[in-house]
A protein has these predicted regions:
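Extracellular/oxidizing-compartment recognition motifs
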Residues: 1-426, 438, 454-455, 474-478, ...
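Alpha-helical support elements that line or immediately flank enzyme active sites
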Residues: 96, 294-313, 367-372, 436-466, ...
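Acidic/polar loop patches that form or flank catalytic/metal-binding clefts of enzymes
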Residues: 108-109, 117-120, 140-144, 455-456, ...
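Active-site acid/base region of carbohydrate-active enzymes
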Residues: 130, 142-147, 151, 366, ...
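Non-catalytic C-terminal accessory modules of carbohydrate-active enzymes
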Residues: 166-167, 174-179, 593, 668-796
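Solvent-exposed loop and edge beta-strand segments that line ligand/cofactor-binding
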Residues: 284-287, 357-358, 423-436, 477-489, ...
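Acidic, mature catalytic/reactive cores of soluble proteins
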Residues: 301-320, 324, 353-357, 375-378, ...
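Non-transmembrane amphipathic alpha-helical segments
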Residues: 496, 569-572, 576-579
Length: 796
C-alpha cells in the first residue's frame, strides 16, 4: 500500500457526537502542546514529531491546527499548510485523510510563531505558540497531542526581520544554513524534547465555561493552490561591490549581457548556475506577470555565500524634490530606475542540494537576486516559484467586439487571483488585509466567474463576527490591529444583499440578518431630529479622490456628509428588500420609513437647484459624482452624472458610478471610464492599481469590477430576485453590436449570444433547469424559460 494524504473540507464538528455534560461539551480528546522552553517571549520555529509503527495498512482522519502557522510532513513529504486564517473565537483546523502502509512512519509539524509585534502580520491573530493534532477512531491514543508522546525541538538558523515598506504583511525570513536543523522534516536529528500540554482543545460546541484560548472550527476553504513555476527572464545582470542596492539605479552601461543566457537557463529550469568565488552579482528578474509565490532555491558548495531575494511590484523613478512619494512610470521599463523591495535572505552552509524557502509567500512582478560568495564558488542548482493563491476554477467568460473589454480579462482575473488567499486581500504586496469595501467588489467579480462561493461566504461570516459593541463591523478582518471605517459596515450589508441575489442559501442569509440590523441601528442612532445622519465615529473613507483628506469628502469626518447620508439611505433600501424577502415585513417597513424620512431631509439640505445636483456638504461648496451615484442608487432620479466640475470617482468607486449609470441609461459613461483600465495596459501593468498615480499598490482587486459589469451591466445578466431563481436580462451594449457570455448559476450555468441590428436583438439565451426570466429591450419584454430561448425583440 502506498502512502496517501488528502486535505478534505468538513462541515461539522468532528467530535460533536460525543455525549458530554454541558460543562464539557465540545471537548476534544487532544490537547494543545508546546515546546517546553518556548513560551512566546519572541519569534520561534518549532518542529513537532510523532514516530509510530503500524502493524497493518491503516486509514485515519486527523485534524490539525497551530498558532500561528504550520507545515505538516508525512515521512518527509509536505502534505499541507495551515492554519487557515481566522480569529481566536473561530480558530480553524484542517482535516486530512491518510492511507498508510504497515511499518514505521513519522509525522512532523513545523510551526512558525512570530508574535504580535511590529514585524508581525496584521491579519494573523495569535494567542501563544502551540500545536494540536487529533485523530479519529482507534488511533487517537496513538496520535493525539497531549495523549501520545509527541516530541519537539526548536529549530535553529531562523531570524525574522521587518518587512520594511511592505508593512503589515509579516516578518521576512533570514535563514542561516549552518545553524539549521536539516532533515527535521523526516524526524531526524537530536535535541528532541517531550512536549508539554498547555490547554485542552475545544470546539465552538462549547456551551459553558468557554476557553480563553482557541475556539476550534473546521476550515472553510480548500487547500490553497501551490504549483511550481519556472519563469522569468533576467533583465539586468550587474557586478556590484555592495549589497546595499536600494539607491543603485539600473543603467544599461552596467549590464553584463553575456551572463544573461545562463541566468535565463536557470530561471526556465534548464541548468544550474555557478557564481564564482569572491563575487557579488545583482540580477533583476522580470517574471512577466504578477505572482504571489514562495521562492524556492537549491544551493550547493559556496560555504557562507549569501543569496538575497527581494520582490517589487515595479521599479521606482528617481526622487523628485518636494515629493515624498516616488513615481514608478511605465511598469515595463527598468532603465534609470531603482529597485526598492522586500524579501528573504538565505546564507548557505556549503553542503550539497540544500533547499531554502521562506515560511510565507512573497508578491510582485520583479525579483532582485543579490548573490555574494566567499572563498568558494556557489552552485545554484535550481530556482523556482511555488505559486500560491486561492484555487479558483473560472467558468465565466465573455466575447465582445470591444478591444478594451477583451484586454481587461487577463488583468482583472489575475488581480482577483493575486488578492485571493485564505481571505480576500486589499493587496498582496502591502497589508494583505481583507477590507469590506474592497471585498464587496471582489466578491461580485467572483460570482460572475465561478460557482465556488466558499471564499465569499467566509468573508461575509468573518465580518459579521467582527462586529463590536457599537454593532459595526471592523473595516478589515481578521486583523489584530482594529480599525473602524463606518461606511464599510454599510458595504457589508450590501454584501449580504448581493449574496442573497446571486446565490441560493436562505439559512445563511437569515443568520446574517441580526448583524444587518445591528449595523443599521448603529447608524440610526446618529440620525438627528431633522432626519440627517451625523458623522459616525471612525475613519469615514469614501474614495481616494486626490484632493480629499485621507479619502474623506467634505464634512465626512465630524459634520454631515451628503454622500454618506445617501449611502445610508441606499443601504436601508437594500436591507428592507432583505427583510421582505426573508419573512420580516415589520423590519422592512421600519427601514423604509427611515429611508423615506432621510431622503426627504437630504433633498432639502443638499439639493442645489442651480447646478441640478446634490452637494457633498451643507454649505454647497463641494460636489462629487459620489453623491449623485448614491442618490441614484437610493432611488432619486432628479440628479445627473454628467454635471461639470464634479469630483470624479477613482478606479474603486467607479463601480458605483457604473451601477448608477446603468439605472439612468448612461452606459456611455462606463465606456468613457474604461480608459482607466486601458491606461494600465499601456503602462505595462499586469493587475489593477489601488488609486490614481502615483499609486502605492499595483495590485488591488477592487479594480477587477469591470469584469463583473461586462456580465451584469453590458450583457445585462442579473438575478430577478433572491436565490437567483429567476433572471432579468437587460443588455446595454453601448457602441457594441453583439456580445456573448456564460456565467455560473447556483443551478448550473447561464449563457447568451446576442446581436443587435437597428435596435432589434436576436440570438439565443440558455437558462438552467428550473430557472425562468425576462429579457428586456426598452419597453419590450420577452419571457424566458428553462433551456434554450430564441430572441426576437425590436427596440431602440
Amino acid at each position: 500500500m502506498k502512502n496517501k494524504s488528502q486535505r478534505v473540507v468538513i462541515q461539522e464538528e468532528p467530535f460533536g457526537n460525543v455525549v458530554q455534560n454541558p460543562f464539557n461539551r465540545g471537548s476534544w480528546s487532544a490537547s494543545w502542546v508546546q515546546h517546553p522552553e518556548v513560551y512566546g517571549a519572541g519569534p520561534a520555529v518549532v518542529a513537532y514529531r510523532r514516530m509510530i509503527t503500524l502493524e497493518a495498512d491503516t486509514t485515519v482522519r486527523i485534524h490539525v491546527s497551530a498558532d500561528e502557522r504550520y507545515e505538516l510532513f508525512l515521512d518527509g513529504e509536505r502534505m499541507g499548510r495551515g492554519s487557515e486564517r481566522g480569529d481566536r473565537h473561530g480558530w480553524f483546523f484542517e482535516t486530512y485523510d491518510l492511507s498508510l502502509s504497515a511499518g514505521p512512519h513519522v509525522l512532523v509539524a513545523r510551526v512558525f510563531w512570530i508574535g504580535a509585534d511590529s514585524i508581525s502580520a496584521h491579519a494573523q491573530i495569535t494567542v501563544r505558540p502551540a500545536f494540536l493534532l487529533a485523530a479519529e477512531g482507534d488511533l487517537a491514543a496513538l496520535w493525539n497531542t497531549g495523549a501520545a508522546p509527541w516530541e519537539a525541538k526548536r529549530l535553529g538558523g531562523y531570524e525574522f526581520v521587518s518587512p520594511d515598506m511592505a508593512w503589515g504583511t509579516s516578518a521576512k525570513t533570514v535563514l542561516r544554513g549552518a545553524d539549521y536543523d536539516w532533515g527535521h522534516e523526516c524526524g531526524a536529528g537530536d535535541s528532541w524534547q517531550v512536549v508539554r500540554s498547555i490547554a485542552p482543545a475545544y470546539s465552538a460546541a462549547r456551551t459553558c465555561m468557554g476557553p480563553n484560548n482557541w475556539m476550534l472550527r473546521p476550515a472553510m476553504l480548500p487547500a490553497m493552490l501551490e504549483e511550481p513555476r519556472w519563469t522569468g527572464m533576467a533583465r539586468h545582470v550587474q557586478v556590484i561591490d555592495t549589497e546595499d542596492t536600494s539607491d543603485l539605479a539600473v543603467q544599461s552601461v552596467d549590464h553584463c549581457a553575456d551572463e544573461v543566457p545562463s541566468w535565463d537557463q536557470l530561471l526556465s529550469g534548464g541548468t544550474s548556475l555557478t557564481i564564482p568565488a569572491n563575487t557579488k552579482r545583482r540580477v533583476i528578474v522580470d517574471l512577466g506577470n504578477y505572482y504571489c509565490a514562495y521562492p524556492v532555491v537549491t544551493l550547493s558548495r559556496g560555504k557562507a555565500a549569501t543569496m538575497r531575494i527581494r520582490w517589487a511590484e515595479s521599479l521606482y523613478e528617481p526622487k523628485q524634490p518636494g515629493n515624498w512619494q516616488r513615481s514608478k512610470g511605465n511598469r515595463d521599463e527598468i532603465e534609470g530606475k531603482s529597485f526598492i523591495g522586500t524579501g528573504d535572505t538565505f546564507i548557505h552552509d556549503g553542503e550539497s542540494n540544500r533547499r531554502y524557502e521562506p515560511f510565507w509567500w512573497e508578491a510582485g512582478r520583479y525579483v532582485e537576486i543579490v548573490v555574494s560568495t566567499g572563498n568558494e564558488p556557489l552552485i545554484i542548482e535550481n530556482f523556482h516559484l511555488l505559486e500560491a493563491h486561492y484555487p479558483y476554477v473560472f467558468s465565466g467568460k465573455y466575447e465582445v467586439p470591444s478591444q478594451e473589454l477583451t484586454d481587461l480579462v487577463p488583468l482583472a482575473t489575475r488581480v482577483l487571483e493575486m488578492c485571493s488567499h485564505e481571505t480576500y486581500m486589499d493587496c498582496p504586496y502591502y497589508e494583505q488585509l481583507m477590507y469590506v469595501g474592497d471585498t464587496r467588489l471582489e466578491v461580485l467579480t467572483t460570482y460572475a466567474l465561478t460557482d465556488d462561493d466558499r471564499l465569499p461566504r467566509k468573508a461575509i461570516l468573518l465580518y459579521d463576527e467582527s462586529r463590536g459593541p457599537m454593532g459595526l463591523t471592523q473595516a478589515r478582518y481578521p486583523s489584530r490591529v482594529p480599525q473602524l471605517i463606518p461606511p464599510f459596515s454599510l458595504y457589508w450589508v450590501g454584501m449580504v444583499h448581493d449574496f442573497a441575489l446571486w446565490r441560493d442559501d436562505t439559512a445563511f442569509v437569515r443568520a446574517r440578518m441580526p448583524g444587518v440590523r445591528a449595523v443599521l441601528d448603529a447608524f440610526a442612532q446618529r440620525v438627528n431630529d431633522v432626519g440627517l445622519l451625523e458623522a459616525v465615529q471612525g475613519w469615514n473613507f469614501v474614495d481616494w479622490v486626490p484632493h480629499w483628506d485621507a479619502g474623506m469628502p467634505a464634512d465626512a469626518d465630524f459634520g454631515i456628509s451628503g454622500i454618506i447620508n445617501w449611502h445610508f439611505i441606499y443601504t436601508l433600501r437594500m436591507a428592507a428588500e432583505l427583510e421582505d424577502g426573508f419573512g420580516e415585513p415589520e423590519f422592512a417597513a421600519r427601514d423604509r420609513r427611515l429611508a423615506d424620512r432621510m431622503a426627504a431631509a437630504v433633498t432639502v439640505a443638499f439639493w442645489d437647484s442651480q447646478r441640478g445636483v446634490y452637494a457633498d456638504d451643507l454649505a454647497h461648496q463641494h460636489f462629487s459624482e459620489h453623491a449623485q451615484c448614491f442618490a441614484i442608487l437610493a432611488g432619486d432620479r432628479q440628479t445627473r452624472l454628467d454635471a461639470p466640475d464634479l469630483s470624479r470617482a477613482t478606479i474603486y468607486f467607479s463601480h458605483y458610478l457604473f451601477e448608477a449609470a446603468r439605472l439612468v441609461g448612461r452606459i456611455d459613461l462606463l465606456f468613457e471610464r474604461l480608459d482607466l483600465w486601458s491606461y494600465l495596459k499601456r503602462m505595462g501593468f499586469k493587475t489593477a492599481v489601488e488609486s490614481p498615480e502615483p499609486s502605492r499598490s499595483d495590485c488591488h482587486a477592487w479594480g477587477a469590477h469591470p469584469l463583473y459589469h461586462t456580465f451584469a451591466t453590458l450583457l445585462g445578466i442579473r438575478p430577478a430576485g433572491f436565490g437567483f431563481q429567476s433572471v432579468r436580462i437587460e443588455p446595454q451594449l453601448g457602441p457594441m453590436e453583439w456580445g456573448r457570455g456564460t456565467i455560473p448559476h447556483p443551478r448550473g450555468s447561464l449563457s447568451l449570444a446576442l446581436k443587435r441590428t437597428e435596435g432589434r436583438f436576436s440570438g439565443i439565451i440558455e437558462l438552467p433547469l428550473g430557472v425562468s426570466g425576462t429579457f428586456l429591450n426598452g419597453a419590450q419584454t420577452q419571457k424566458l424559460y428553462p433551456g434554450k430561448n430564441t430572441l426576437g425583440l425590436s427596440g431602440n
